[in-house]
Amino acid sequence: MRIEHDFIGQMEISDEVYYGIQTLRASENFFITNDKLCSYPVFIKSFAQVKKAATLANVQLGLIDEKLKIAICHACDLLIDGKYHDQFIVDMIQGGAGTSTNMNMNEVIANLALEYMGHQKGEYQFCHPNDHVNRSQSTNDAYPSALKIAIYERLSNLVAPMKALRDAFAQKAKEFAHVIKMGRTQLQDAVPMTLGQEFETYALMVDRDIEQVLDARNWVRELNLGGTAIGTGINSHPDYRSLIEKKIQEVTGRPFVMANNLIEATQSTGAYVQVSGVLKRIAVKLSKVCNDLRLLSSGPRAGLNEINLPKMQPGSSIMPGKVNPVIPEVVNQVCFAVIGNDLSVALAAEGGQLQLNVFEPVIAYKLFHSFVILGRAIETLTTKCVEGITANEKICHDYVFNSIGIVTALNPHIGYEKSAMIAKEALKSDRSIYDIALEKKILTKEQLDDIFKPENMLSPHAFKKHKD
């Protein structure tokens, strides 16, 4: 055991751990979610990148020596490479605007650096968590900057599964291009379309959301490093701000810049609201698609039954043979959670006061949670559902030609009133539109066959009105 102290008192710390007294206090104070910082390696990596960039700037400004720089950068590189992440034990939701997270990072880096230099953990006179690792920084600029860097990476990582889902829908659109089916509005028969057209819209929806995700990265490119406590830059070198911008770009390989006004950037959480809004948009639209898939596959004998979803597991403990659409159902629920997380982000952003928003920890937690579950849900939907969907072509075809909805195709030829009369009689007599129109000699068989050709009902085409 080793003894560490702060201005509150002292505590015993295990010699096996790399965190220190402030981390231990925080872990005891904030047992809230049991979801710890180590659950989000992208945040640990981005925070280590901030610390490394700051160290590189500090040594160039003569604020720390070369020996410390080498040791601290070595420690940061270990964390960036995914090592020692189990040392990050603070709860994601915490009081203090993220100070506990920042100090967990400072203490682990300091003790790794001490070990590298041949010292014992806790010998902070040689490398101090605050004086050296946190030099030229405050939690109030380090935490949000690390968070934005992590969000940038999570946005980038979300693109690949979204592209896979888009491509899966596009492939189904090609497979189903020849399958005519009934389009529906307000759950009522409308006009014909193809199943391929239906799936093509899903592919396009995802493609447009990919554009939104890529654009959202621009909202988190502005950092507030160098602002320190409230954005005025107190305790930082006059040249630190311009230098840290270059160093963070070098360390991350990403186009991050410092905000023009660091005071505004320190208190603003608008970028998080925008990013969360994009995730909510994806969730809302994805949930709607899952609603469609569940409805289109309903049955199999007393529902629409136009498509078949892959059979994943038995669906009932009491009804033999029942199979449920479990994959769309789980994605629906993920989407509900993401939408709820967005509300939490909005409330936390609104709750800020004066020069700092202390609620960034819950913003970070909800955003990371949304990224994780949404990414997994998209992958699950792609591989366990969409790729295995098949069409019930005969059912789709029969729905069209037994439907009242195809009467719409007669409108340009015989007018609305005659078409409505035919529809009314078809409903009353339970006969087809085609048979009634032919029986009443409103149109010839040749004319009806031409009008009801699938290709003439699926897209705009030239026509001429038939005489009475």
UniProtKB/Swiss-Prot annotation:
One of its GO terms (biological process) is aspartate metabolic process. The keyword Acetylation does not apply. One of its GO terms (molecular function) is aspartate ammonia-lyase activity. Pfam families: FumaraseC_C, Lyase_1. It comes from the Bacteria. Its EC number is 4.3.1.1. Catalyzes the reversible conversion of L-aspartate to fumarate and ammonia. This is Aspartate ammonia-lyase. The gene is aspA.
